[in-house]
């Protein structure tokens, strides 16, 4: 049977876990096999900028960081389960990718 690989990514951990739990509940209700959510390494994007706009004065820096959290879910591509997954309300800050694999 075909599998669906669902990749979730977000800067907000709570909304990411919420979507992953909804997918998990759908899998339990429909009785399909599921593995995950597997936490993937968090990508940390760091940007360091000078506080002073003109370059004069003491060298003080602002440090900014953006963390991108990811989860991976493999689920059997059952038609009923996939229809319910497609109808999940996904918050704006969560990116979702669904890929069918054999």
Curated annotation (Swiss-Prot):
Transmembrane annotation, as ranges: none
Domain of life, per lineage: Archaea
GO biological process: translation
InterPro entries assigned: Ribosomal_uS10, Ribosomal_uS10_CS, Ribosomal_uS10_dom, Ribosomal_uS10_dom_sf, Ribosomal_uS10_euk/arc
Swiss-Prot/TrEMBL keywords: Ribonucleoprotein, Ribosomal protein
SMART domains, A to Z: Ribosomal_S10
Ranges in a coiled coil: none
GO cellular component: small ribosomal subunit
Keyword Hydrolase among UniProt keywords: no
Gene Ontology MF terms: structural constituent of ribosome; tRNA binding
Nucleotide-binding in keyword set: no
Pfam families reported for this sequence: Ribosomal_S10
Assembly, per entry: Part of the 30S ribosomal subunit.
Family: Belongs to the universal ribosomal protein uS10 family.
Function, in words: Involved in the binding of tRNA to the ribosomes.
Protein name according to UniProt: Small ribosomal subunit protein uS10
Species for this entry: Pyrococcus abyssi (strain GE5 / Orsay)
């Amino acid at each position: 049977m075909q599998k669906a690989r669902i990749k979730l990514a977000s800067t907000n951990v709570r909304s990411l876990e919420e979507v992953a739990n909804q997918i998990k509940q759908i899998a339990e209700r429909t009785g399909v096999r599921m593995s995950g959510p597997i936490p993937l390494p968090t990508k940390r994007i760091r940007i360091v900028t000078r506080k002073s706009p003109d370059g004069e004065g003491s060298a003080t820096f602002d440090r900014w960081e953006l963390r991108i959290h990811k989860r991976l879910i493999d689920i059997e591509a059952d038609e009923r389960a996939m229809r319910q997954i497609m109808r999940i309300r996904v918050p704006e800050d969560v990116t979702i990718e669904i890929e069918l694999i054999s």
